[in-house]
Amino acid sequence: MAPPGDPRRLCRLVQEGQLRALREELEVAGGCWDPEMFRGSQGPAGDTLLHFASRHGRQDILAYLVEAWSMDIEAANRDYKRPLHEAASMGHRDCVRYLLGRGAVVDSLKKADWTPLMMACTRKNLEVIQDLVEHGANPLLKNKDGWNSFHIASREGDPVILRYLLTVCPDVWKTESKIRRTPLHTAAMHGCFEAVQELLERCHYEPDCRDNCGVTPFMDAIQCGHVSIAKLLLENHEACSSATDSLGAQALHRAAVTGQDEAIRFLVCGLGIDVDVRAKSSQLTALLYAAKEGQTSTVQTLLSLGADINSTDERNRSALHLACAGQHAACARFLRQSGLKDSADLTGALAQQLTRGVAILQDFDPGVKS
């Protein structure tokens, strides 16, 4: 049987919320138990019992450990998380309020410069966010990637939380990450329709604001398959459907890479985008991009929309070359079944010569043995 004060047993009692048993255990251990001896005994995180209590929402145990054993509410684990980070990240309001009431540092930084408010914004718990802000949390602080709390809330997509942050800090939307991505990019990428609506109504982002790669929120919405958001950006934000990124690729090309067939149909049939338009730098069409990524269904969709199956890039490589170079057997097979013949590129190489897998080689030559 484990001796009194055994770290594993104490941890279990805290997680299960067994305050009475925990109190009895520690009273038996008495002077033999040192709170600091617990640190590090529960794995590489270096958590204290306060971390466990805060993480699991055990406010009564949290108060007991602080008041009866004088445990340090600012104790950091190996990720520099304080108990307040744990309580905020899990949405345990009673623990958050207790720690703040005991004087916990509201904007303490964990690894990667995340504050408790940032972590609270990963949860749709407005009351916890309000408690932190009312105790002085700064929504404008940024983590190591350049994200502030509004950025994080935009990813989660709760318009009520976004509205609250804009009310208490009207300039919080004026932010970019280190790669120049705005909260509008983030909300569009993650398919948060109501959040995008809120951002367009309350904030003043430039139409087609670009990140370091030249990607616009419209491109983000399209390449992730969020057609309703793409329509919203077109109607309410005057987004440009043919804008190009830093490599000269349009939203159509990016949708081909990610295999977003519905978005491709919307662009071609709904907006009249040329299905064979080329990216400026690579001269790849959407069909070539899809073949390069092995997106067989998207290749089929593009062909059904009239894409030129014989299109080639600046090195005269066909879709078959790109599919074979990527060892995409199913895609290469579909292209051949659709009538695309093997041909030489500018170096004289055939698509078949780029294959390595037996499955693809057998499609070209049934006599190849497995």
From Swiss-Prot:
Signal peptide coordinates: none
Top-level lineage group: Eukaryota
Keyword RNA-binding applies: no
UniProt record, GO biological process: tRNA modification
Subcellular location field: Cytoplasm; Nucleus
Keyword annotations from UniProtKB, A to Z: ANK repeat, Cytoplasm, Nucleus, Repeat
SMART domains tied to this protein: ANK (SM00248)
Keyword Heme assigned: no
Main location: cytoplasm
Site (Required to capture Ser that is misactivated by AARS/AlaRS): K111, K144, K174
ANK repeat feature ranges: 45-75, 79-108, 112-141, 145-174, 179-209, 213-242, 247-277, 282-311, 315-344
Gene Ontology, cellular component aspect: cytoplasm; nucleus
Entry remark concerning the domains of this protein: Side chains of Lys-111, Lys-144 and Lys-174 capture Ser that is misactivated by AARS/AlaRS.
Functional note: Required to prevent the misactivation of serine (Ser) with tRNA(Ala) by promoting the hydrolysis of Ser-mischarged tRNA(Ala), thereby playing a role in translational fidelity. Binds directly to the catalytic domain of AARS/AlaRS and captures Ser that is misactivated by AARS/AlaRS, preventing the charging of Ser adenylates to tRNA(Ala) and precluding Ser misincorporation in nascent peptides.
Complex and partners: Interacts with AARS; the interaction is direct.
Annotated protein name in UniProt: Ankyrin repeat domain-containing protein 16
Protein species of origin: Rattus norvegicus (Rat)
